[in-house]
């Protein structure tokens, strides 16, 4: 979410020159905990609050939608899988692309680290009660996912819709490709909210920044940046 919030902060600071916003990325878990402890005014989260995180005074505001986009090496002929097949790949039940009608090539699974909101959303939507295969390559950033995919013909990974690199193949899920339209109408099933979080110790201007993010100007910036705005353009 960092590039999204940086774009919003740049425009907000032009309108409010005395406003200073320091942005640090560390995953949704870090952001949520920092707001809970009063270390920051605003947290970034790309997943819903868990039961233990829903403390009194914590408020989550969705400002955009994103999709988890499944990507593979450009040489991979498989262009679509089902959600069930994707779960089987990441749990280790399916280990070779030939099982899906592809090349006789071992599948190399790439996942994000546990503190990542992207990982949390993927585990919830795709893995469910299954567990990630122990042999998976776990990386910290979307850029590292792309690097691994580009170097390994059998690799599969996931990135956010707003972080989609041009050098990979996008894999459709249940026959539906990720587009702004399919994300908004829920036909693309790997969807997640991008939200800002405030707590009882957050200062007033934190709420004003969130109001800007959900304004027409803020939503326009979100669309221009490649994410899916929650409010259609007027």
Where are these regions (language model features)?
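Exported/periplasmic ABC-transporter solute-binding proteins
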Residues: 1-234
């Amino acid at each position: 979410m960092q590039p999204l919030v940086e774009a919003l902060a740049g425009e907000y600071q032009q309108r409010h020159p005395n406003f200073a916003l320091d942005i640090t990325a560390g995953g949704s878990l870090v952001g949520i905990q920092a707001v809970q402890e009063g270390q920051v005014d605003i947290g970034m989260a790309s997943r819903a609050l868990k039961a233990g995180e829903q403390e009194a005074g914590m408020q989550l505001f969705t400002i955009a939608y994103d999709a988890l986009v499944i990507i593979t090496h450009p040489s991979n002929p498989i262009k679509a899988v089902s959600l069930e097949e994707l779960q089987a790949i990441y749990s280790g039940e399916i280990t070779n692309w030939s099982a899906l009608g592809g090349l006789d090539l071992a599948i190399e699974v790439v996942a994000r680290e546990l503190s990542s909101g992207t990982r949390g959303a993927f585990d919830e939507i795709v893995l469910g009660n299954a567990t990630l295969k122990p042999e998976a390559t776990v990386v910290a950033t979307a850029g590292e996912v792309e690097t691994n995919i580009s170097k390994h013909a059998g690799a599969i990974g996931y990135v956010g819709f707003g972080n989609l690199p041009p050098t990979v193949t996008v894999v459709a899920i249940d026959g539906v490709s990720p587009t702004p339209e399919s994300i908004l109408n829920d036909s693309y099933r790997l969807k997640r909210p991008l939200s800002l979080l405030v707590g009882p110790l957050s200062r007033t201007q934190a709420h004003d920044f969130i109001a800007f993010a959900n304004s027409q100007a803020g939503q326009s910036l979100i669309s221009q940046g490649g994410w899916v705005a929650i409010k259609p353009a007027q």
